[in-house]
Design a protein with these regions (language model features):
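Glycan-recognition and catalytic cores of secretory/periplasmic carbohydrate-active enzymes
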Residues: 1-119
Length: 119
């Protein structure tokens, strides 16, 4: 994921396969889980580039996914970076689980003084 799934802006692509990029859109849940996943890799491996990837993904989410006008996160950004108006913020398969979990998880990890190799 680190080598092939990240866009230049720090975000995670929606989907890739053996033949390459399939969907360059950005989904809220993938960005949220990438923050935790990359930070987890940093804690396990101690390699700073994973912490940097987590931070860049978080910065992307804050800059592009957070809906500052109506609240919550946009669930999907089109390939051109605009919010996908066809997706709901909440529904049978959409809820604030992933981004809430990422925030709680990162607050816990950043506040407990854990260092690489501490997991």
């Amino acid at each position: 994921v680190y080598r092939e799934g990240l866009d230049r802006d720090g975000s995670l692509f929606a989907e890739a396969g053996p033949t390459g990029l399939v969907d360059a859109s950005k989904s809220w849940w993938a960005q949220a889980e990438a923050v935790v996943g990359f930070y987890n890799a940093y804690q396990l491996a101690g390699k700073p580039h994973f912490a940097e990837a987590a931070a860049r993904c978080w910065e992307f989410a804050q800059a592009r996914l957070v809906d500052r006008r109506h609240g919550d996160w946009f669930k999907r950004l089109n390939q051109d970076g605009t919010p996908d108006d066809a997706t709901y913020k909440a529904g049978p398969w959409e809820c604030p689980y992933h981004h809430s979990r990422a925030c709680f998880e990162m607050l816990s990890r950043l506040n407990d003084g854990s260092r690489p190799g501490a997991l």
